[in-house]
């Protein structure tokens, strides 16, 4: 997986240097994420709630438009991804809790664009992400009873891949759907008590997002 990341970065660098400055442009801005998850534990579907994450979600894209109707893009992004779950059964005490899981990820996307590059276009692509900060909160009867935080935690699958599709609207507005192909948790993780808290937990995160590309190169992003 690390080889894939390095290859993607090198490919992006070579593609950028291969075009003149006028052929390539950048866009940057923020993303507001509304995430869900398809979750099951011990084979039974679990109840999950909408997770609203307005921060910290930043992204910068490098674009190459081959015509006014087709282009490619790549870039780098930092985002806050996760889900909320009711009825998590803790294998250590067989009690049921409410859980909130999240991860701060840095990602490298690669994709294509079809439509009118100066107005409205549709896009799709693939993204590889590295989860660098994991957080987990446990609630009982509405009160927080535990919190876990870890850098590059083995509780989650640190390397995550996803597919995305969306539409770019005028004035920098953007609507996107993303589905994570990689399970959120590392099922093989074993804690200090010898228990695997996620062994029976299957979780696939997906989200809708609303983002605004605030800048095109160094100027305010507005189509005339």
What residue spans do the PLM features occupy?
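Boundary at the C-terminal end of the N-terminal hydrophobic targeting segment
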Residues: 18-20, 83
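Short glycine/proline- and aromatic-enriched beta-strand/turn motifs that initiate or cap beta-hairpins
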Residues: 20-63, 211-224
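Residues on the lipid-exposed face of transmembrane beta-strands in outer-membrane beta-barrel proteins
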Residues: 32-34, 54-64, 76-78, 106-116, ...
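Predominantly the C-terminal beta-signal and adjacent terminal strand-loop region
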Residues: 151-224
């Amino acid at each position: 997986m690390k080889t894939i990341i390095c290859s993607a970065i090198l490919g992006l660098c070579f593609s950028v240097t291969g075009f003149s400055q006028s052929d390539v442009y950048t866009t940057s801005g923020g993303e507001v994420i509304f995430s869900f998850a398809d979750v099951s534990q011990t084979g039974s579907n679990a109840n999950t709630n909408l997770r609203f994450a307005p921060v910290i979600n930043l992204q910068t894209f490098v674009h190459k438009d081959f015509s006014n109707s087709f282009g490619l893009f790549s870039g780098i992004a930092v985002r806050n991804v996760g889900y909320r779950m009711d009825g998590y059964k803790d294998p250590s005490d067989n009690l049921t809790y409410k859980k909130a899981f999240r991860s701060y990820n840095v990602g490298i996307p690669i994709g294509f664009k079809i439509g009118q590059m100066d107005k409205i276009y549709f896009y799709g692509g693939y993204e590889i992400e590295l989860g660098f900060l994991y957080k987990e909160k446990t609630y009982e009867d509405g009160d927080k009873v535990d919190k876990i935080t870890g850098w590059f935690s083995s509780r989650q699958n640190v390397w995550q891949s996803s597919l995305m599709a969306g539409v770019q609207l005028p004035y920098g507005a953007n609507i996107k759907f993303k589905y994570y192909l990689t399970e959120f948790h590392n099922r093989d993780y074993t804690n200090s008590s010898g228990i695997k808290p996620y062994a029976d937990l299957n979780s696939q995160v997906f989200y809708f997002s609303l983002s605004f590309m605030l800048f095109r190169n160094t100027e305010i992003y507005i189509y005339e």
